[in-house]
């Protein structure tokens, strides 16, 4: 997941925090109005956070078939999946998905600087030690913990010279950050600080100084100068990349982090583990710097007793410091040589692990995590003491040569982890720890509050505990030598939790310690054949790992010296053990839940590696120098096979626990990445909404401007219309005045007409009265005439009636005469008839 800062106004100019603390820190007010809602403002990082930087891990990979170094373009072709049994492909293939996650996650080391000295916390972050093999040369201040905390990421906190004097940090200073946020941050940081693949080897960087300068592109220097602060530009010019300030700009006598840093865990994919930052003490006035390592080797018990000081401080001469600085600056590119350190009698210097080119210097890490770890330390010590007192202490870690580990048979008491297979996941030799390690540890006593319980244990015990599910487990080693005095003192320190201190954690003034300074003229290389004899043959490897292989662990361990091609032409100095752990951690992190019986990544330490053998660095004597003492080697190789098998079982249990914890932390990191992606989506959506709102507002403004222009034109036309209307109004006014005049004249006419009407009315009344009189007279005359006519009619009617009665009487007379005539006629007729008859 990568958090890309969206706007520079939310980012300060000081790019000194690259951790995940911004997820838990409250947002700060920028003084500007924000376009985000209240719910969206919580998703924006605070102002004082730096931009996210992608760190690329550019240690060259090798092709599985040709074993050639791959270019960055060819390395991307190895992402093809391989079968579970394809251990060769798993060994040589760098998990790109892990690398991509590491590029996205913010990488930060809790480093504190005091006068240019990198200070580390006393309690080590050993959560991801993985298969930290027991055979591991923890010489005086040369190893910082079991399995060698790999590639101490101190370079990310380089400090400018001008600010180095102002960085004195008190050991008891505690930040106000919440413990829960810090623990989750530490867990996510420890998970992604993985180690380089098993196919990569460590190379003596002094021989590749010129090659690194030739291969480093010019753009890297320019990029480094551009990205680092002003105080770290000098450091970038010398190395081509951002070198650690503790190496490039340290005062004379200061030891670089590679001088006593832990061997990197080579089996886990991804980048190297970062060592936690620690508390610091003042630097001595003589300009020298002493580095404290809590875990020291047992062969120091043979040295004078004045070597027993708090933390096994070691002081380098200026010549050695310059050589170490050259190694630190040149160890960032190219393959590195794998070397084994079995000469524990002398103090050995760590070969610098591969430098990651993508890191930037000049970043000051926060000071919160170290203080929280100091608070967590007493609880972890009490839990560890309870474990060591209840159960038996695991025996000495065994040197695993070449074997195949079957997880199903781990519970079988007769199972031998070394049997049968010649392939190995990791191989180391763990020298017994010095019995005087517990003496003079003021910082450890301050951090671990409770008194330690004293119980006897075997020769070498490895104690592992975890304070809580979120606390970082601390691997604690307690060893004893075969001598009687060493055994007696180791019993007192077997169950005591020792704080794991990384290089530069507690510089103690040299005038307070009795250990003499390390001189390079005392270092020499001696052929193992001169010490152990030539009885070990090549065919003796066939018996390695079998149940009958019990008689000579000394001869078995001598094979590492006799047949290791890396030690054939190695320089005459005790070289550190390069830890090659298996990739069980990387294989177990697959989301499909790979079963327990998955094979380990197989790496043959006895096979020839096709890499150039570098020559001795400057200031190191030639192989022909004085021989080394053989006592520490013999003491180391006298451990029995049973002890080695027991330690293998303990280491496997530790690996199971660490693997499950790594899976849990990996899941948390993935969830955190999803959350950050959602945060980014919310911010992007908010910005898109703001952009859309701006576009809409612009469109509305354009529309309003157009409306304004339209209204202006309408107003002009309305003014013209109003002027025309006003002219018409003036004309109408004149017309109305004419109407008023006409009305007055009409009123006069009406008055005249009314006067005439009244006069005519009067005349009408007069005429009406005259007509009425005449009508009355006419009516009277008509009545008289009518009465006369009626009288005359009555007279006429009476005369008519009289005449009608005369007519009726005459008619009756006529009728009677007629009847009489008829009767006379009939009588006559009768008489005539009768007369005729007669």
Curated annotation (Swiss-Prot):
The modification Phosphoserine is found at residues 25, 39, 71, 175, 177, 250, 317, 402, 434, 558. Keywords: Acetylation, Cell cycle, Cell division, Coiled coil, Cytoplasm, Cytoskeleton, Mitosis, Phosphoprotein. Residues 132-164 have a biased composition (Low complexity). One of its GO terms (cellular component) is centriolar satellite. Residues 522-577, 594-838 are annotated as: Necessary but not sufficient for spindle localization. Induction: Up-regulated in various cancer cell lines. Its main location: cytoplasm. Residues 123-227, 311-527, 569-594 are annotated as: Disordered. Residues 637-837 form a coiled coil. Residues 204-227, 403-412 have a biased composition (Basic and acidic residues). Residues 492-503, 579-591 have a biased composition (Polar residues). The keyword Cytoplasm applies. The keyword Nucleus does not apply. Gene3D superfamilies: 1.20.5.1700. Plays a role in the microtubule-dependent coupling of the nucleus and the centrosome. Involved in the processes that regulate centrosome-mediated interkinetic nuclear migration (INM) of neural progenitors. Acts as a component of the TACC3/ch-TOG/clathrin complex proposed to contribute to stabilization of kinetochore fibers of the mitotic spindle by acting as inter-microtubule bridge. The TACC3/ch-TOG/clathrin complex is required for the maintenance of kinetochore fiber tension. May be involved in the control of cell growth and differentiation. May contribute to cancer. Interacts with microtubules. Interacts with CKAP5 independently of clathrin. Interacts with CKAP5 and clathrin forming the TACC3/ch-TOG/clathrin complex located at spindle inter-microtubules bridges; TACC3 (phosphorylated at Ser-558 by AURKA) and CLTC are proposed to form a composite microtubule interaction surface. Interacts with CCDC100/CEP120. The coiled coil C-terminal region interacts with AH receptor nuclear translocator protein (ARNT) and ARNT2. Interacts with GCN5L2 and PCAF. This is Transforming acidic coiled-coil-containing protein 3.
